[in-house]
UniProtKB/Swiss-Prot annotation:
Gene3D superfamilies: Translation initiation factor 3 (IF-3), C-terminal domain, Translation initiation factor 3 (IF-3), N-terminal domain
Job of this protein: IF-3 binds to the 30S ribosomal subunit and shifts the equilibrium between 70S ribosomes and their 50S and 30S subunits in favor of the free subunits, thus enhancing the availability of 30S subunits on which protein synthesis initiation begins.
Record protein name field: Translation initiation factor IF-3
Family that this chain belongs to: Belongs to the IF-3 family.
Subunit-structure text: Monomer.
Gene (UniProt): infC
Coiled-coil spans in chain: none
GO biological process, one term: ribosome disassembly
Highest taxon of source: Bacteria
Lineage of producing organism: Bacteria, Pseudomonadati, Pseudomonadota, Betaproteobacteria, Neisseriales
HAMAP family: IF_3 (MF_00080)
Localization per record: Cytoplasm
Amino acid sequence: MIAQEREARINGEITAKEVRLISESGEQLGVVSVREALAMAEGQDVDLVEISPTAKPPVCKLMDYGKYKYQQAKKRDEAKKNQKQVQIKEIKFRPGTDEGDYQIKMRNINRFLADGDKVKVTLRFRGREMAHQQLGAQLLERVKEDLAEVAQIESFPKMEGRQMVMMIAPKKK
């Protein structure tokens, strides 16, 4: 039962008759019986850890298992820390967005793209503006043209209820 919880079998949990043994320093000690390997581990006051159970014979190493587990956890945490979570930022426009507001929104979109985030550009129609959807399409087309050198369009403008939506992702370097 305990063996399934751990990623590696240690000491008495190793079921093979013979193992390929590696010392603490990484030196190959050859193929030895499990009893012999366990005796060596006990003599050096370390654990016998099965590193590669699928090999024939299985590869085991003499090491401090607690220290090994700690280093594995540290490696896992480091890998997790280095992964960047891509976020989706949303910028909302209206069909009547003025030039000054447009420039500010474009500056924000550029900043989000520079940070590596995706941007969802939403154009919201209210009331009678629904009759002038071509104005919205023109505005999103302008956004697309202004961002041509820094972004790629992930999903082209499409209507979703009362809003037109377009997804933009940073260009791959």
